[in-house]
Amino acid sequence: SSAAFIVDAAKINLPSGKKSLALYLYPEESNGNNGWERSTEYTKASIEHYSKKWYEYPYPVAVNVASNVGGMEYPAISFCGYKAKGGDLWGVTDHEFGHNWFPMIVGSNERLHAWMDEGFNTFINEISTIHFNKGEYHRSYGTKNFLTQALFNPSLEPVMSSPQNMRERHIGYLAYYKPAYALRILREEIIGPERFDVAFRKYIEYWAYKHPTPNDFFRTIENETGENLN
C-alpha cells in the first residue's frame, strides 16, 4: 500500500475528433527515474497510434493503474506492475492496451485460438514500438537462438492448438512470438506493408464486435490482397 497515489491525465486525440482521456493512477513510490511519470505519455501514444493505424479506440477513457500484477487488461482499463520503468513500462502498457483491439474489438476466441489474441497483439505492438518516440524502445525480437526456439523447435505443438493442448513452457512461443513473427514475414516479405496494412484494417473493420475464426481471418486477407495464403 502507499500513503499517496498520483493521478495524471491527458487528452487522447482520436481521428474522428471524438474525445477520450488517458488516466493514470500510481503510488508516489513509482514516480521518477523514467518510471510512471511517463505513463500518461505512453498510453496516449499507444492508443493514438492504434486508432490512426488500425481502428479507432471506442471508449471514452483509458485507465492504467499501477498494481502488484505484471500486466492484466480489461476493456478501457489495464493494470501494470508498479515497479516497471522505461522500456519495460512502455512494453507492458502498449501490450495491455493493445488488447483493446485483440480480443476486445475483434472478439476472437482466445481460449481456442490464442494466436489470434496474443499473437495479433504482439504483432501490432512491434509496429507501435517502432513508431513511438522515433523508436526509443524498439529492439529486435531476440537472438538467433531465441528465434530458432520460437520458430523451428520440433517439440513445439502447432500454433493452431488451443492453450490447453500446449505445454505451459511453450505458450509464450506459440501464442505470442511465432504468430507475431509469421505476420511480420507476411507483411514485410510476402504481401508488402502497404497492401497488408489495408487488408489488416479491413479485417478489423469487418470483424469489429464479432467473433471471427481463423478461416475468417485467412479469407479476409486473401480477398483483400488477392493472394492465396495456402
Specify the residue positions occupied by each region the protein language model found.
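Active-site-adjacent structural elements in folded domains
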Residues: 63-65, 84-88, 162-171, 184, ...
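Loop/turn elements at helix/coil->beta-strand transitions in domains of secreted/extracellular proteins
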Residues: 18-21, 56-62, 98, 191-196, ...
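Active-site-adjacent bridging/hinge elements
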Residues: 18-19, 70, 95-100, 148-163
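Second-shell loop/turn segments in exported
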Residues: 28-37, 79, 83, 110-111, ...
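Zinc-dependent metallopeptidase catalytic helix centered on the HExxH motif
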Residues: 37, 79-143, 200
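Acidic/His/Gly-enriched intrinsically disordered linker/tail segments
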Residues: 112, 118-189
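Amphipathic alpha-helical substructures
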Residues: 172-230
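Hydrophobic helix-coil surface modules that form long, contiguous segments used
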Residues: 1-94, 123
